[in-house]
């Protein structure tokens, strides 16, 4: 809720101001490991409209350095070099596998967390620090009680698994369908 209140915003990755629609479309490429829909396409407008509807009544939260919505997640105090991958594996199997499956592939209600259908190595969650911070505030669903160390251990385990490589040019539609893109095609 409130995500739309952070846009337009400066994006260091794209090195320019982006709109909510830009952000949504870029998630198709990185977090969903798919092709970026064209700007103004039916799916683009539908998803952006939905996200905006979830932000109704929220105050605008502009930030000149990066997008910051009401749910902005602060990085944890623990650092990746303090992680224990074996402890992370054990925690994953006892706390996460019920929904995301032992093999990390998820099911019809829960997304995969590694493998060919998961987020790629260009997604924000492919950073151990980002994933740990997100796990701390969002997982397990409806019972967010992981310690900072547990979130970090699970993050290092999950991100040690195979996932698709992000290649920007392979995630863009053809030039004829692209419309305006918000970054250099070399990033």
Predicted regions and their residues:
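Short, solvent-exposed loop/turn and secondary-structure capping segments
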Residues: 58-63, 108-110, 166-172
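Post-cleavage N-terminal segment of exported redox proteins
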Residues: 12-85, 161
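Sequence/structural segment immediately N-terminal to covalent heme-attachment motifs in c-type
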Residues: 67-110, 128-130
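Active-site/pore-lining binding-face segments in mid-to-C-terminal subdomains
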Residues: 119-165
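Detector for the c-type heme attachment site
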Residues: 52, 99-105, 118, 159-162
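Gly/Gly-Pro-rich "capping" loops immediately C-terminal to redox-active cysteine motifs
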Residues: 1-23, 105-137
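A cross-kingdom marker for long, charged
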Residues: 162-187
